[in-house]
Amino acid sequence: MISLLQMKFHALLLLLSKVWTCICFMFNRQVRAFIQYQPVKYELFPLSPVSRHRLSLVQRKTLVLDLDETLIHSHHNAMPRNTVKPGTPHDFTVKVTIDRNPVRFFVHKRPHVDYFLDVVSQWYDLVVFTASMEIYGAAVADKLDNGRNILRRRYYRQHCTPDYGSYTKDLSAICSDLNRIFIIDNSPGAYRCFPNNAIPIKSWFSDPMDTALLSLLPMLDALRFTNDVRSVLSRNLHLHRLW
């Protein structure tokens, strides 16, 4: 009799635990959705005639974007979730086959990434450049693009240069005119050959209150008017060591 009661009690605890986990999951998803689409954004104003004329005098520039820990963070089903708090909902999944083994990635989008891409795609030609394998990077880029055709140009691990256990990214392979190309990347090593063509950003894993992408918009809005991005970005060299 006592054993039966214990079994029922444990079953009840298990059920309550699952219900609580489900409630926490749904609550966290709603919080993330609210933060992602909250109306506090970078306000865009129509350009004045003077600004339009100034912009017409310079060439349209190329903005290169890293993926992992810059725009998104992911973990796969064979890797412990030590970078993401338990119960944090993912935004989408990516299923790929690596070395004949099926791998499922759970992908978390950095807060405001959709709005960020919408805005900067109006100012720049966007390029994805990731040190990840193409089969994974392409699937993630497809999800971020979401049918908008703003992330059509993509470079992957095979386009990187091996460098002491890591990878560097050759921006000149994308655009030989270095005065109109720059990269946003959380890893300074990735652009160490092009420090004057880079904007550092702090690595992101799961902080739902992160506003790094929004914070970059005023600078990116102004940078499109310059003749040479290096004239501005070369002043940021001290920032690359912070990340």
Swiss-Prot record:
EC number from the UniProt entry: 3.1.3.16
Example GO molecular function: protein serine/threonine phosphatase activity
The protein's enzyme class: hydrolase
PROSITE patterns membership: FCP1
Biological processes, Gene Ontology terms: nuclear envelope organization; positive regulation of triglyceride biosynthetic process
Domain FCP1 homology: 56-223
Key word Membrane present: yes
Membrane topology: Single-pass membrane protein
CDD domains: HAD_FCP1-like (cd07521)
Residue ranges of the TM segments: 11-27
Similarity remark: Belongs to the dullard family.
Function, in words: Serine/threonine protein phosphatase that may dephosphorylate and activate lipin-like phosphatases. Lipins are phosphatidate phosphatases that catalyze the conversion of phosphatidic acid to diacylglycerol and control the metabolism of fatty acids at different levels. May indirectly modulate the lipid composition of nuclear and/or endoplasmic reticulum membranes and be required for proper nuclear membrane morphology and/or dynamics. May also indirectly regulate the production of lipid droplets and triacylglycerol.
The protein's name in its UniProt record: CTD nuclear envelope phosphatase 1 homolog
Organism from which the protein derives: Drosophila pseudoobscura pseudoobscura (Fruit fly)
Underlying gene: l(1)G0269
